[in-house]
Amino acid sequence: MPSGTLGNHVALMTHCTDGKSVLLDDKQHSYRVEKAAFFPYWGGLTPVFFKLSEEGLPLIDSVAAGLDSGVRLLCLENTHNSAGGVFLPQKTLKMLRTLADRAGIPIHMDGARLFNAAIASGMDASEICSYADSVMFCTSKGLGAPMGSL
């Protein structure tokens, strides 16, 4: 893809059809900056928000409540740029995966800075993504490419 925005839009609209709901927090890049997926004339998706802790991590009870509302996709950002660059620990991702599986919905990860997170955490990028059904990462963030995302 030419950009992370397009990569995320393709993922969101692959998992959801027009008018379906996506569970995410209101600070995520996918919502704050890439809003077109939520415009009626483009993606037509409806945002449902979960809350973050003071540390910038998803509040599990808030996610569980959102999943009960009939959403079709759980969207996460890892690392979460607008939450201070917080890295979502595997323990948190595993709990979120369990909740999503119970609800029968996929997880999309906006991993724009995935490889930065891998280096900082000492984890393999595939391990960080292991609980997601789809992942977008930018080749222009820490990998030296002038633009592009996968």
Q: Where are the language model's segments positioned?
A:
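Conserved PLP-enzyme active-site core in the AAT-like
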Residues: 2-150
